[in-house]
């Protein structure tokens, strides 16, 4: 019964408040800038959808999606991430698992991504497991607020 209650807390639409990387050597990084926007949706049928838009993205000069320069296309890709699929909640581990069906980054398709979670009132904190780096380990942290 408790798992149902926790899963129900996920359901709905969430607005991104913060997105940053915390390195084991003390550094903080902002992969989508210091003021990104984003939306995360969990429904009652185990589906999710998430998007993050980097701050400072610039429009293509031509105004045409198919006629951007290589630099414009690269910047647009690097400043945005989107993915969707199904999810499951493991309350005992404090984890939500995303089974990726589609994503802007093709390597994520078919991937399983597990995030640690905690709720603080109407806020949801998601964080990755430590990612091994050459100099330090990284944990990506996203703080969401119910929209």
Where are each of the predicted segments found?
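Lipid interaction determinants
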Residues: 1-147
